[in-house]
Amino acid sequence: MKRVISVLLVALLGLTTRGSAAVNGDVSGDGNVNVSDVTTEINQILSGSTDGQFDVNGDGKVDVSDVTTVINIILGVYEDPNLKLTGADISLLDRYEEHGALYYDKTGAQVTDMLAFYKQIGLNAMRVRLFVDPANASTTAKGEGVFQDLAYVAKAGKRIKDAGHKFILDFHYSDSWADPGKQTVPKRWSSLTPEVMADSVYAYTKESLQALIAAGATPDYVQVGNEITYGMLWPTGNVYPDGANNKGTWANFSAYFNAGAKAVREVLPAAKVICHIEMANNSNPGKFFGIGAKNFNLDYDIMGLSYYPAYHATASTVITALETVIKQLKVQVPDKPIMIMETGYSYRWEMGGTKDTNISSKYPYTEAGQAQFVADLVTMLNQYECVKGLFWWCAEQNEYGLDWNTNRVLDNWWQASLVDNQNGKILQGCYELANFK
């Protein structure tokens, strides 16, 4: 063991260390994680220490694996297994800032860098969607925010990484919105057979990831598809119900999904693959999807959910509807952590398509009502160790400061932003989000 430890130390001494004020790995107690911590850890191992303070990786032992963990922390490649991600889908942020949207914090001070602000209040991860050829999207879809091509995502992703956030990449595998109601094949793939489609998914995913890495926008987590409760790349990848709709099959869908996952594994072996489904008013989505995913060996690390109370709950089940699904997934896919990849609740007006119009009796459509929803949601989620992520969808949407007639970003307001469109104020719900930990 002494020889193994010596080799590790010699290798590390040849590197430029990167100190940080992180507690995890700072076994020497000097406020940094560097070579002195490796030396301290080695000395503790050689002395036969069983002090839990030096059990850096939390496996109940003090041994050479803890030295490796300290080294990985210094190199920046260690992923804390207990890390929880808190953030938002901010796919519109760069466009809003380019157009001159004005943001203000709760003190009234102008925020000129929203990514730095998010980091300051305690958020640590941001998601951006990627379309194949968004130029092919309809005028309506473009007015809803469909424009994120690879060049845009590369720029946004680099900003996210440079700001110190984890970067979640959301592949839509479509030229426009992909969700439980539509998973339209990109125009460039419209005539492909299932076999060639899978090959195309693999090649496109691999090329996109390589381009992002080259741009300094390396994703930490990758969604292979968006809200794929009923499959992807329809009709051949449609699996509702059980593959009977439009002659889609689980075999096709799993081939498409696993082709994307394979590209992620090859290009970014340290990245986590997220399988993102949506509750779709289904009282037990995991039973349908989880069983199929297991039977067809979908290759993923994390189960992602979308949860919008306006569409998935009633006034009496705003919090419990999601909690019920979390409990079900703990049984159906016990080995998979869960992340809430999308959620949202209005701060002023009822969202179109609201399932229960009495829902505002529980959480009024006000800044305080929205904030209380976030607080109650976070309180519930914090009770479940299996829940490792929480993301607000379109948190950055803000037309304040723009000329609506000539310079707007969206044609319609998203009612559940975490910014008030009328004055640019960042709402209390944004601050509440940071309490998920």
Give a label for each model feature.
Residues 85-90, 126-128, 167-171, 220-224, ...:
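Hydrophobic faces of well-ordered beta-strands that scaffold small-molecule active sites
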Residues 6-16:
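Bacterial N-terminal signal peptides
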Residues 117-272, 278:
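Substrate-binding cleft and catalytic face of glycoside hydrolase catalytic domains
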Residues 220, 226, 275-279, 286-320, ...:
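Aromatic- and acid-rich polysaccharide-binding/catalytic face
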Residues 96-97, 101-109, 133-151, 229-232, ...:
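Acidic-and-aromatic substrate-binding clefts and catalytic sites of carbohydrate-active enzymes
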Residues 328, 348-437:
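Aromatic-rich peripheral "rim/lid" segments of glycoside hydrolase catalytic domains that contact
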